[in-house]
């Protein structure tokens, strides 16, 4: 079973600073498993849902609201509340809960605890039956072989993309989690690139729309390129936040007494800093991202003879959706924790426009028009031949086409703040045993430092780690050949995430050293396959209808038939092959989906019988105890 909850509103909190609040969620009977939910202090809600596994029956939750969780001087406890929920919870879907002090946790204590505040929590109780991987293996094989289906337009991922009204975001996230660390991500993504190119009507808008390939590549950029993005942009963004210089160049917006020329110079100085940070960063980009961009260029080059289209495809992801989007909204990409004020926000908007303009000019063959005439002078400066040449070289280098002699940097898979525990030190206060550390997990090492800007205080090769464990106090113990490390995580869920991430990279590194590539499934891979199965089973009737239409050989209605069946974007010589392969894909998918659903049904039946037997045994025990009395 899975508990899902999020905060939809909160109020009455006495905040010292405009910081992110943290709601810790645990069960009364298992306080070691703690979930963490971030609450935006400005919007007074959590943007994400917290999902936690839980047992059946009545569930007693303990919700604790904190600010600054790492036990520092600024840590603030705002209160806690107990919530009881079960499968038939009638108090929802949202309800106000009033926070209590620790003394009033069980309803005891005085009434003079002060006004702590309150929060609204929306709780959804959901039961998911996740089966063993061997049940999902046939579906996983179909997904992994999607890049080998000929023609590529008839693969399972092409079918998923064509299903009506499908949210591609969650699907792409599950596919990336399943494939990103295997050797199947590249052929599968390449097949989706082909689909997007064939469906595109105008090469100038290539990969600008919503597609499964675009969603998957963006998911990889934001997941595996997160640290690369932050280290590249943060120095510039922090400087803009700190200095707050006026960069307004629109005459209609310039304040009275302000110098338009000075503002223009300020904007150009910031842009030059941003430009240099971006165009010299290709050596820091994770190699996986470079490989996928290299595949993107190859596929585009195969299907288009126009020069510059390959760079256009790369820039649409790396510049438009990644760097320019992050500059525009640094908080959403976790470059900053605070929202920019109006002046800083305007500066970031103008810089994002300039970066996009330069990128478009470096990949375009002709002149570009502009609706904002007042920006033309700045556009001419930032789109000089030198700027365009450097940008083009960056797009080549980051897609492995330019200088391949670049040194390969490591890929950061996880990073965050933990407390390093050193019990060997003699300290008169327990708190002195704890030191705040910024910890990074790469594909080869575990690195820790005082903060993100400081030099590393220590590093351990993953190959030297012999054992990793997490205790009930959220202490992560890492045993190496020459030392033992301990880090304390803010909660049980985060500690488990670190444990799984370290073990995953250790296993991956061991396979690479032994040269035994295989299926490196991470913990909870079954849940992601089950999400895809649930989607396919939801559209089972749609897939059966498509299969029957194709097998009947009846002429399709041009107005109502789905594009996947009409295949107007497929060349005439391959349409029959597309049809035959699509029928085979649909038949296999329906059979596999039915088999998984049958396993779910049998599991539910066995579970019901087991619960009935337990109920009968419990009832008989009660009768015996009553008769003795």
Curated annotation (Swiss-Prot):
SMART domains documented for this protein: PH, RasGAP
Gene3D superfamilies: GTPase Activation - p120gap, domain 1, Pleckstrin-homology domain (PH domain)/Phosphotyrosine-binding domain (PTB)
Compartment(s): Cytoplasm
Coiled coil spans: none
Molecular function, one GO term: GTPase activator activity
This protein's GO CC annotations: cytoplasm
One Pfam entry name: RasGAP
Keyword Cytoplasm: yes
Keywords: Cytoplasm, GTPase activation
Biological process, per Gene Ontology: associative learning; chemosensory behavior; long-term memory; negative regulation of Ras protein signal transduction; short-term memory
Domain (PH): residue spans on this chain: 411-507
Leader sequence residues: none
Role this protein plays: GTPase-activating protein, which inhibits the vulval induction by acting as a negative regulator for the member of the Ras family let-60. Probably decreases the signaling activity of Ras by stimulating its intrinsic GTPase activity, thereby lowering the levels of GTP-bound, active Ras.
Identification of the protein by name: Ras GTPase-activating protein gap-1
Native source organism of the sequence: Caenorhabditis elegans
């Amino acid at each position: 079973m899975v508990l899902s909850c999020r905060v939809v509103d909160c109020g009455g909190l006495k905040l010292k600073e405009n910081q992110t609040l943290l709601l810790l969620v645990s069960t009364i009977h298992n306080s070691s498993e703690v979930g963490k939910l971030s609450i935006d202090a400005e919007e007074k809600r959590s943007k994400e849902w917290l999902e936690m596994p839980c047992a059946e029956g009545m569930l007693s939750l303990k919700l604790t609201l904190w600010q600054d969780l790492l036990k520092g001087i600024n840590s603030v406890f705002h209160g806690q509340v107990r919530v009881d929920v079960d499968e038939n919870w009638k108090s929802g879907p949202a309800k106000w809960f009033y926070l209590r002090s620790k003394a009033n946790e069980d309803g005891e204590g005085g009434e003079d605890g002060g006004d702590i505040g309150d929060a609204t929590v929306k709780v959804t109780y959901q039961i998911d039956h996740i089966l063993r991987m061997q049940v999902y293996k046939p579906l996983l094989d179909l997904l992994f072989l999607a890049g080998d289906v000929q023609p590529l337009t008839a693969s399972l991922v092409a079918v998923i993309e064509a299903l009506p009204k499908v949210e591609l975001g969650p699907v792409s996230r599950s596919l990336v989690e399943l494939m990103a660390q295997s050797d199947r991500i590249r052929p599968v993504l390449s097949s989706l690139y082909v689909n997007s190119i064939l469906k595109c009507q105008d090469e100038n808008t290539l990969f600008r729309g919503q597609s499964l390939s675009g969603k998957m590549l963006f998911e990889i950029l934001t997941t595996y390129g997160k640290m690369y993005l932050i280290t590249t942009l943060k120095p510039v963004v922090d400087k803009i936040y700190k200095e707050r210089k006026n960069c307004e160049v629109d005459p209609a917006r310039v304040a009275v007494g302000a110098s338009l020329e000075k503002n223009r110079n300020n904007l150009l100085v910031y842009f030059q800093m941003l430009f240099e940070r971006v165009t010299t960063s290709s050596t820091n980009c994770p190699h996986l991202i470079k490989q996928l961009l290299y595949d993107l260029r190859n596929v585009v080059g195969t299907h288009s003879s126009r020069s510059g289209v390959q760079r256009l495809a790369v820039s649409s992801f790396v510049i438009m959706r990644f760097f320019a989007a992050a500059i525009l909204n640094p908080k959403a990409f976790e470059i900053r924790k605070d929202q920019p004020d109006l002046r800083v926000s305007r500066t970031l908007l103008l810089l994002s426009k300039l970066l996009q303009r330069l990128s478009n000019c470096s990949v375009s063959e002709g002149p570009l028009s502009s609706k904002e005439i007042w920006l033309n002078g700045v556009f001419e400066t930032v789109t000089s031949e030198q700027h365009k040449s450097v940008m083009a070289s960056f797009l080549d280098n980051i897609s492995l086409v330019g200088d391949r002699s670049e040194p390969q940097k490591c890929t950061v898979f996880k990073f965050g703040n933990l407390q390093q525990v050193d019990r060997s030190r003699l300290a008169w206060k327990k708190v002195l045993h704890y030191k705040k550390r910024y910890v990074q997990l790469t594909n080869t090492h575990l690195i820790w430092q005082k903060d993100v800007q400081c030099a590393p205080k220590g590093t351990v090769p993953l190959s030297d780690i012999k054992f990793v464990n997490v205790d009930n106090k959220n202490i992560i113990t890492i045993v190496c050949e020459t030392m033992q490390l301990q880090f304390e995580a803010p909660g049980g869920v985060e500690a488990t995430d670190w444990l799984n991430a370290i073990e995953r990279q250790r296993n991956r590194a061991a396979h690479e050293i032994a040269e035994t590539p295989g299926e490196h499934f991470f913990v909870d891979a079954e849940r992601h396959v089950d999400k895809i199965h649930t989607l396919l089973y939801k559209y089972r009737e749609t897939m059966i209808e498509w299969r029957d239409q194709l097998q009947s050989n009846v002429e399709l209605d041009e107005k109502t038939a789905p594009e996947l069946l009409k295949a107007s974007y497929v060349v005439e010589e391959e349409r029959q092959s597309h049809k035959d392969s699509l029928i085979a894909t649909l038949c296999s998918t329906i059979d596999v989906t039915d088999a998984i659903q049958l396993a779910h049904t049998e599991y539910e039946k066995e579970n019901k019988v087991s619960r009935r037997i337990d109920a009968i045994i419990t009832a008989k025990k009660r009768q015996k105890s009553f008769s003795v009395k």
